[in-house]
């Protein structure tokens, strides 16, 4: 709502929530929501290694980080995008890519691949499919690269567009 309306109170609320999540309720790997009840946040700094950390929460945090970048700019939202993508989102997918996980505790090595929830597989797929939306952004006169991913993109800008070609082997 803050981006769509420009309402200052919404902007302040978004920034307060962003700070609460990223400074006090997110693990170093970008996971959030340690409580199994409603995949909920806990108290400030409640970040246990055996927390719940649902895959869809990681996808949602990427969406929130992208919107905060559009609202405020700044490197912190790009840093969160990168941390969550390469750690929390990818943690929800098996190494062979054939399974996904609903829960992603940091210290558990025996995760159950089957669950009755059907939200995570398509949400993880959607997030990975849209990585370009998270990687690039443009303003009237500025182009932004939030994720180091190889690719080519044409970004609309005031009075035209700019093309970018990114060559990298990062993060591999």
Model segments located where?
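Glycan-recognition and catalytic cores of secretory/periplasmic carbohydrate-active enzymes
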Residues: 1-172
